[in-house]
């Protein structure tokens, strides 16, 4: 079996598992944040848990980039920068800004670690080995320009939304609060 065949099987597996989890989450609340409860195994500090969940996104991507055959092309370097900006922030900055005191179940950490590890392999291996090489003129293609615009918009929205959530409670408050403002205007339901 070739690596591309294994890659495609993992993609099919991800689609099937993703659809199953999507349906399951209509009936079961994932046990973190306000929904944390007993029965999901031991808990650890949520900052450490988030860091552990996200670290594969940086390490695996960087390793695949470094062993990849296309690491010196301009597009490969740009993809590396885009990935590292997003996941560097999610791994090394976001967890340490979390104000919530609730612990995180190790089970959730294992699920996140597994997803992030496999997803990072799929993304990096595609870019640096399995796809056709991205030529430098692809930088000016509508696909890249639109994709970069979506990424930058999403990154800014993500940072802003994280800030709103961090500032929901005043020091000493513990009750659940519904976020509002920014994009929460479209997704929150009181």
Regions found by a protein language model. Give the residues of each.
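Kinked, hydrophobic transmembrane alpha-helices enriched for aromatic residues
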Residues: 187-190
């Amino acid at each position: 079996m070739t690596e591309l065949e294994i890659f495609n099987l993992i993609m099919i597996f991800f689609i099937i598992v993703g659809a199953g989890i999507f349906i399951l989450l209509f009936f079961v609340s994932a046990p973190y944040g306000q929904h944390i409860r007993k029965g999901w195994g031991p808990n650890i500090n949520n900052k450490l848990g988030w860091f552990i969940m996200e670290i594969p996104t940086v390490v695996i991507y960087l390793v695949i980039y470094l062993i990849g055959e296309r690491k010196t092309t301009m597009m490969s370097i740009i993809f590396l920068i885009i990935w590292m900006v997003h996941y560097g922030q999610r791994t090394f900055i976001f967890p340490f800004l979390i104000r919530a005191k609730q612990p995180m179940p190790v089970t959730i950490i294992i699920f996140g670690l597994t997803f992030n590890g496999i997803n990072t392999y799929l993304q990096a291996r595609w870019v640096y080995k399995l796809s056709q090489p991205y030529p430098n003129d692809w930088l000016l293609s509508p696909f890249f320009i639109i994709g970069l615009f979506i990424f930058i918009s999403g990154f800014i929205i993500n940072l802003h939304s994280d800030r709103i959530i961090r500032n929901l409670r005043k020091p000493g408050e513990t009750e659940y609060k519904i976020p509002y403002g920014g994009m929460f205007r479209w997704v929150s339901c009181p």
